[in-house]
Swiss-Prot record:
DNA-binding region as annotated in the record: 201-220
Protein task: Binds to DNA non-specifically. Could be a regulatory factor involved in maltose metabolism.
Keyword flag Ubl conjugation: no
Protein name from the UniProt record: Sugar fermentation stimulation protein A
Family: Belongs to the SfsA family.
PANTHER family linked: SUGAR FERMENTATION STIMULATION PROTEIN A
Keywords: DNA-binding
GO molecular function terms attached to this record: DNA binding
Organism lineage string: Bacteria, Pseudomonadati, Pseudomonadota, Gammaproteobacteria, Enterobacterales
Amino acid sequence: MEFSPPLQRATLIQRYKRFLADVITPDGRELTLHCPNTGAMTGCATPGDTVWYSTSDNTKRKYPHTWELTQSQSGAFICVNTLWANRLTKEAILNESISELSGYSSLKSEVKYGSERSRIDFMLQADSRPDCYIEVKSVTLAENEQGYFPDAVTERGQKHLRELMNVAAEGQRAVIFFAVLHSAITRFSPARHIDEKYAQLLSEAQQRGVEILAYKAEISAEGMALKKSLPVTL
């Protein structure tokens, strides 16, 4: 998936109020960007990092510029816009770039399901196959090439795992899909040191038939695509 129009470059001054970030452009202008990420963004928002941002043509937006990528001072590319995780996953499924999720004839988004009134990110369907429920999570937390999720305690994420376990118990296919959006990550694990309950539930989910997949995106200032399966250790 290519960025169109092309992203523009700036240097991060600070992120604040969760949804805002101040940057300085190469020609010395200071801009305030919308930050589409409510998480901790650990390691993704260090002052001095290069920021790649898009610009909306919607004149009614108070902040027309959106922070899309960070290029860390070590050179790693990180997608901080969490909306891209679902977009890239959908593109990869439709292109059959994810072998484990190929061979389905129908893809539906945001389908209501479960006893806790959830919406599944994607449902895949095909004749003579169980429905496949896919919950997508964006992974950007990295420590020494190890990717982790979540970067903060997530009761919502815990709920999704419970829902997926129920789906698997009903004989349908249940998948938790970790979209790794950090170019330095080479392997994935749940962040037990941040959310022990989530890590416990993920292990329980696997034992109860929920499939765990992690795929890494190739990221540059020109575009992104999910390409490579990564090893998962619970």
